[in-house]
């Protein structure tokens, strides 16, 4: 049984997966820019966790779309 996300990602034209990938990549790029600027230790740790979560999301998306 496929999840709702897997169903949406299985659409033949792949527009949903491409749009989702683009949004995740943009969010990750912004997070990395903030990390490069520096922050207080608590905010820096939060940004690192956010970057790891976004990278994980991109990895899952790649597995689901078999890129």
UniProtKB/Swiss-Prot annotation:
Tell me which InterPro entries the record gives: T3SS_PscE/YscE
- Disulfide linkages recorded for this protein, renumbered to the chain, are none
A Gene Ontology biological process noted in the UniProt record is: protein secretion by the type III secretion system
Major subcellular location class: cytoplasm
Q: Which UniProt keywords apply?
A: Coiled coil, Cytoplasm, Virulence
Instruction: Look up the coiled coil feature and give its residue ranges.
Output: 16-37
Q: Does the keyword tRNA-binding apply?
A: no
Q: Cite the Gene3D superfamilies for this sequence.
A: Immunoglobulin FC, subunit C (1.20.5.420)
Q: In UniProt terms, what is the effect of altering residue 43 to R?
A: In strain: 388
Where does the record place it? Cytoplasm
Q: What is the effect of changing residue 24 to S?
A: About 50% loss of ability to lyse macrophages
Q: One Pfam match, by short name?
A: T3SS_needle_E
Effect of disrupting the coding gene: Deletion mutant looses the capacity to lyse macrophages, indicating the absence of a functional T3SS.
Q: Which GO terms describe its cellular component?
A: cytoplasm
Give the family, as the similarity comment puts it: Belongs to the YscE family.
Q: What does this protein do?
A: Chaperone of the type III secretion system (T3SS), also called injectisome, which is used to inject bacterial effector proteins into eukaryotic host cells, facilitating the establishment and dissemination of infection. Along with PscG, prevents premature polymerization of the PscF/SctF needle protein within the cytoplasm. Required for type III secretion needle assembly. Also required for cytotoxicity by influencing PscF/SctF levels.
- Subunit architecture: Forms a stable ternary complex with PscF/SctF and PscG within the cytoplasm. Co-stabilized by PscG.
The protein depicted here goes by the name Type 3 secretion system chaperone PscE
Q: Which organism is it from?
A: Pseudomonas aeruginosa (strain ATCC 15692 / DSM 22644 / CIP 104116 / JCM 14847 / LMG 12228 / 1C / PRS 101 / PAO1)
């Amino acid at each position: 049984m496929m999840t709702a996300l897997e169903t949406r990602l299985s659409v033949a034209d792949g527009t949903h997966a491409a749009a989702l990938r683009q949004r995740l990549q943009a969010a990750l790029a912004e997070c990395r820019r903030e990390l490069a600027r520096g922050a207080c230790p608590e905010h820096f740790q939060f940004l690192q966790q956010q970057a790891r979560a976004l990278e994980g999301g991109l990895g899952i998306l790649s597995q689901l779309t078999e890129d």
